[in-house]
Amino acid sequence: MSLTVEQKAEILKEFGQGENDTGSPEVQVALLTKNLAELQDHFKEHKKDHHSRRGLLRMVSRRRKLLDYLKRKDEKRYVAIVERLGIRR
């Protein structure tokens, strides 16, 4: 259910600003988005898994806060990441 090292490295390469960039908002949002997509597949099969659903809601909230921060600091980067990931806003 969690991302493999290879998947994380691929996301870092695609969205990171440098080789070891793991802290930029774009990378964090991309990682959370990938995790959320995998969790949504999990919930299609396990509808009554309320314990994990709480974790999903925390991740959605974290992504929302990161996107709000990015929008406040640099709206161009915000628009670019929302379009690249296909996030509804």
UniProtKB/Swiss-Prot annotation:
Gene Ontology terms: biological process: translation
Spans traversing the lipid bilayer? none
Its keywords, alphabetically, are:
Ribonucleoprotein, Ribosomal protein, RNA-binding, rRNA-binding
One GO term in the molecular function aspect is: rRNA binding
The domain of life for this entry's organism is: Bacteria
Its cellular-component GO annotations read:
cytosolic small ribosomal subunit
Q: Could you tell me what this protein does? A: One of the primary rRNA binding proteins, it binds directly to 16S rRNA where it helps nucleate assembly of the platform of the 30S subunit by binding and bridging several RNA helices of the 16S rRNA. Forms an intersubunit bridge (bridge B4) with the 23S rRNA of the 50S subunit in the ribosome.
> Per its UniProt record, what NCBIfam families does this chain match?
S15_bact (TIGR00952)
Subunit arrangement?
Answer: Part of the 30S ribosomal subunit. Forms a bridge to the 50S subunit in the 70S ribosome, contacting the 23S rRNA.
Per the similarity annotation, which family is this? Belongs to the universal ribosomal protein uS15 family.
**HAMAP family listed in its UniProt record:** Ribosomal_uS15_B (MF_01343_B)
Record-given protein name: Small ribosomal subunit protein uS15
**Gene of this entry:** rpsO
